[in-house]
C-alpha cells in the first residue's frame, strides 16, 4: 500500500497524530485529536478504530494513541509533502507565510511521490519550511531543533536575570492572524529578540527585535507560538 492509496481522511489523521508529538511529550489521545481537528469525539473514535484495524496505530480503549512504524512512515511522508509545498508557495510563487498552510493542506493529497521528489530537488533540498519547521528527508529522518517555546524559556529565567536574548527558530502556523502580527513587528524565523519582563502583575512579556527601538508586548498565545534558542542572558549588574 502506498501513501496515495490511503484516503484523505486517513492521511490527515496520521499527520495530526504525528504533529501532536512533535513539540510535546504529552500522550496523544482521542480528546487531543478532537481538539486539534475540531471534529466530534464520536467521529474521532470511529476513525481511530479504522486506523487500528489497518495496522497504522495502536490504541487501547480510552488510552493513548501511538503510531505504528508503518503509520509513522506515512505520517512523516505527509508532513514532508506539506512543508515542501509551503516552501514552494513562499519561495517560488510569492505567497506570504500566513497564506500557505490551508493551500498546502489542499494540495498535499493530490500530488505523487515522484512530484514531491522533483519538488524537493527543485527547491534545493530545504531543511526547514517558511515557519522554521523541519522538513523530513526522503528517508523519513527529521532534523531535531534545539528550541523551546518562549513561554517555557521565559519561565525558566534565573532569578535576577534582567534580559534574555534568543533566536527565533520556529513559529507555529496555526493562526494566520498571529503570523501577520509577527511579520508586522519583525518577529520572523531567524530574528534575534531581547526579552524582558512585562509590567508588574501582567502575564505579558516584552521583546525587542534587534535593531528596533520599540518593545513589543506579547501575551501567552504569542509566546506559546514562538520557539526559540538561547543566545545569552544578562543580569542587572551586567546590563
Task: Tell me the role of every PLM-derived stretch.
Residues 42, 98:
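Key DNA-contact positions within bacterial/archaeal DNA-binding proteins
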Residues 13, 33, 44-54, 190:
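Basic amphipathic alpha-helical segments that dock to polyanions
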Residues 30, 48, 86:
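Helix-turn-helix DNA-binding elements, focusing on the entry/boundary residues of the two helices
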Residues 63-82:
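Basic, amphipathic "hinge/linker" alpha-helix immediately C-terminal to the N-terminal HTH DNA-binding motif
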Residues 1-38:
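Extreme N-terminal segment that seeds HTH/winged-HTH DNA-binding domains in transcriptional regulators
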Residues 109-222:
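Mid-protein regulatory/catalytic core that forms ligand/cofactor-binding pockets
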Residues 52-62:
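A short, conserved structural fragment
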Amino acid at each position: 500500500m502506498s501513501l496515495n492509496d490511503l484516503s484523505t481522511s486517513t492521511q490527515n489523521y496520521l499527520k495530526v497524530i504525528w504533529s501532536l508529538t512533535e513539540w510535546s511529550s504529552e500522550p496523544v489521545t482521542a480528546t487531543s485529536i478532537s481538539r486539534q481537528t475540531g471534529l466530534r469525539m464520536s467521529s474521532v473514535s470511529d476513525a481511530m478504530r479504522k486506523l487500528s484495524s489497518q495496522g497504522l496505530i495502536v490504541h487501547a480503549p480510552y488510552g493513548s494513541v501511538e503510531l505504528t512504524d508503518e503509520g509513522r512512515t506515512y505520517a512523516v511522508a505527509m508532513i514532508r509533502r506539506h512543508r515542501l509545498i509551503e516552501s514552494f508557495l513562499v519561495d517560488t510563487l510569492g505567497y506570504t507565510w500566513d497564506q500557505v498552510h490551508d493551500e498546502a493542506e489542499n494540495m498535499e493529497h493530490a500530488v505523487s511521490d515522484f512530484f514531491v521528489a522533483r519538488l524537493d530537488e527543485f527547491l534545493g533540498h530545504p531543511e526547514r519550511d517558511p515557519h522554521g519547521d523541519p522538513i523530513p528527508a526522503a528517508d523519513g529522518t527529521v532534523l531535531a531543533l534545539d528550541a523551546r517555546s518562549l513561554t517555557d524559556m521565559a519561565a525558566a529565567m534565573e532569578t535576577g536575570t534582567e534580559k534574555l536574548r534568543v533566536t527565533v527558530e520556529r513559529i507555529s502556523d496555526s493562526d494566520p492572524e498571529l503570523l501577520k502580527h509577527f511579520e508586522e513587528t519583525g518577529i520572523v524565523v531567524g530574528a534575534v529578540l531581547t526579552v524582558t519582563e512585562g509590567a508588574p502583575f501582567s502575564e505579558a512579556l516584552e521583546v525587542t527585535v534587534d535593531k528596533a527601538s520599540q518593545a513589543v508586548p506579547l501575551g501567552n498565545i504569542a509566546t506559546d507560538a514562538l520557539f526559540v534558542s538561547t543566545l545569552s542572558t544578562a543580569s542587572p549588574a551586567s546590563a
